Structure formats: C-alpha cells, structure tokens
C-alpha cells in the first residue's frame, strides 16, 4: 500500500507528485489494468512473451 506523509511545510502539490511517483514505481495502475478483466492463459502467455522480448531487446 502506498502512503505519503506530509511534511510540516510541504504543499499538497508536491505530496501529490510524490504519491503519483510511488504508485507508478509500484506498478499499481498496471496491475489494476490487468485485473480489470479476466485474462485467459493464452493471453497471459502472449503478454509474458512480449515482455520477455522487450526486456531482451534492452
């Protein structure tokens, strides 16, 4: 779970920016996107193969 504790003189904008960065690094939104609909085993294999190709390229 992502939490952001505000400092004494910290503004909402900077706290929101930190929160968005932490959510992005944790991969929470990507996880929500994948779990929005049921993913069949074939789709899962395809997604993992594409990710492996992308990882191998870099």
Swiss-Prot record:
Q: Record's GO cellular component, any one?
A: ribosome
Which UniProt keywords are present, listed alphabetically? Ribonucleoprotein, Ribosomal protein
Among the GO biological process terms of this entry, one is: translation
Question: Which Pfam families does the record cross-reference, listed alphabetically?
Answer: Ribosomal_S21
Query: What PROSITE patterns does the annotation carry?
Result: RIBOSOMAL_S21 (PS01181)
Q: Name one GO molecular function term.
A: structural constituent of ribosome
Q: Which family does it belong to?
A: Belongs to the bacterial ribosomal protein bS21 family.
| Protein known as | Small ribosomal subunit protein bS21B
């Amino acid at each position: 779970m992502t939490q952001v504790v505000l400092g004494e003189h910290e503004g909402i904008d900077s706290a929101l920016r930190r929160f968005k960065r932490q959510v992005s690094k944790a991969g929470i939104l990507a996880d929500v996107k994948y779990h929005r609909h049921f993913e069949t085993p074939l789709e899962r294999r395809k997604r993992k193969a594409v990710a492996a190709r992308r990882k191998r390229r870099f």
